[in-house]
C-alpha cells in the first residue's frame, strides 16, 4: 500500500513525519503522524500508538504535547492517526463537533450512512498497525497504546478488547463510561443504533468487567478542574470501581488545578512515555 510523505522534520535526533495513504477500512485518504527516534536508524523499535480526542487531527499531539524528547530517549516509534475518516461527503458529518468528522469514537459503525467509512476501531487495531509494521522499523510484538479524552476511551477499549495485543495502556482524561454520558450516547446511537448491548462492547467500564486477559497495568491522569469531568462526560469513578472489583491494577491520579487541555497533557506526558517504555523495553 503506497504511502505519500507529507512532511518530515528533525526533532531530538529523530524525525517527525506525516504520511497520507488510501485506507481500505475507511474508504478514504487518511493522514497519520509517525515519529522515528534515532534508534530506528539502526534497528527495530517498539511502537506506541496515540489516539487523539474530539475535533483533533494527526497534528494536535505532535505539535502540542512535547512528547518527542522522551520518545527519543526511550527509543519509541510513536504513531498518531487522525480521529475520523475525512472527506466522505456523508450528509450530517460536519453538523456538530462531537459527531461525524473529527469524532469517530474508535468504533466500527453498524448503521447507515456511517458503516461504510466510520470503522476507526478496525483501522486503529488492524489496518494501521499492519501498515506501520510493513513500512517502518518497528517490532510487531512490542506495541502499546494511549490517548486523550475520546482517544483515552479508544486506547482503553483497544487494550481491553484485545488481551495481549498491547503491552501497556494509559490515558489522559478518558471518556470511561460512554454508555452513560451525553457524548457517548450521541455517538453510539448514531454509529451503532439503539441496541445498547452493542454500545457496551465499546465501553471501557463494561469491558473491564469481563476482561479475561493477561495483566494490564493501567495509568490514568485526570485534571481536577476539567470542565468535562464536572459535566459528567468522563465518569472515571465508574471505571476505577470496575477495575477494583476485577483486581486489575490501575493508577489513577487526580491532578489538582489542571484542565482538559494539551497544557495538562504536556505536563504529564513524560510519565506516560516512561510507563510504556517500562513494558515495551522490558
UniProtKB/Swiss-Prot annotation:
Assembly and interaction partners: Homodimer.
Gene that encodes the chain: ESD
Pfam families according to UniProt: Esterase
One Gene Ontology term of the molecular function aspect: S-formylglutathione hydrolase activity
Residues the record lists as N6-succinyllysine modifications: 4
Alphabetical keyword list: Acetylation, Cytoplasm, Cytoplasmic vesicle, Hydrolase, Serine esterase
Catalytic activity: S-formylglutathione + H2O = formate + glutathione + H(+); 4-methylumbelliferyl acetate + H2O = 4-methylumbelliferone + acetate + H(+)
Matches recorded under PANTHER family: S-FORMYLGLUTATHIONE HYDROLASE (PTHR10061:SF0)
Record note on what altering residue 226 to N does: 9% of wild-type activity
GO biological process, one term: formaldehyde catabolic process
Effect of residue 260 to Q: 1.3% of wild-type activity
SUPFAM superfamilies in UniProt: alpha/beta-Hydrolases
CC terms in the record's Gene Ontology section: cytoplasmic vesicle; cytosol; endoplasmic reticulum lumen; extracellular exosome
Name this protein carries in UniProt: S-formylglutathione hydrolase
Family: Belongs to the esterase D family.
Organism: Homo sapiens (Human)
Positions annotated as active site in the UniProt record: 149, 226, 260
The EC number(s) this enzyme carries: 3.1.2.12, 3.1.1.56
Amino acid at each position: 500500500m503506497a504511502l505519500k510523505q507529507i512532511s518530515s522534520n528533525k526533532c531530538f535526533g529523530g524525525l517527525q513525519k506525516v504520511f497520507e495513504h488510501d485506507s481500505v477500512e475507511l474508504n478514504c485518504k487518511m493522514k497519520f503522524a509517525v515519529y522515528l527516534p534515532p534508534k530506528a536508524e539502526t534497528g527495530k523499535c517498539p511502537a506506541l500508538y496515540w489516539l487523539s480526542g474530539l475535533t483533533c487531527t494527526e497534528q494536535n499531539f505532535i505539535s502540542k504535547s512535547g512528547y518527542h524528547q522522551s520518545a527519543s530517549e526511550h527509543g519509541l516509534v510513536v504513531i498518531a492517526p487522525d480521529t475520523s475518516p475525512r472527506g466522505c461527503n456523508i450528509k450530517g458529518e460536519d453538523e456538530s463537533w462531537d459527531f461525524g468528522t473529527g469524532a469517530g469514537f474508535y468504533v466500527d459503525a453498524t448503521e447507515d450512512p456511517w458503516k461504510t467509512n466510520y470503522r476507526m476501531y478496525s483501522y486503529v487495531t488492524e489496518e494501521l498497525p499492519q501498515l506501520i509494521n510493513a513500512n517502518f522499523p518497528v517490532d510487531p510484538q512490542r506495541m502499546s497504546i494511549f490517548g486523550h479524552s475520546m482517544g483515552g476511551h479508544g486506547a482503553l477499549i483497544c487494550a481491553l478488547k484485545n488481551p495481549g495485543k498491547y503491552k501497556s495502556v494509559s490515558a489522559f482524561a478518558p471518556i470511561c463510561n460512554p454508555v452513560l454520558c451525553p457524548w457517548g450516547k450521541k455517538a453510539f446511537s448514531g454509529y451503532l443504533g439503539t441496541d445498547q448491548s452493542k454500545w457496551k462492547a465499546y465501553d471501557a467500564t463494561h469491558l473491564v468487567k469481563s476482561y479475561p486477559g493477561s495483566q494490564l497495568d493501567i495509568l490514568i491522569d485526570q485534571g481536577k478542574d476539567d470542565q468535562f469531568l464536572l459535566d459528567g462526560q468522563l465518569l472515571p469513578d465508574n471505571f476505577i470501581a470496575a477495575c477494583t472489583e476485577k483486581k486489575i491494577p490501575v493508577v489513577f491520579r487526580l491532578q489538582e488545578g489542571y484542565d482538559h487541555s494539551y497544557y495538562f497533557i504536556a505536563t504529564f506526558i513524560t510519565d506516560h512515555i516512561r510507563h510504556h517504555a517500562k513494558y515495551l523495553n522490558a
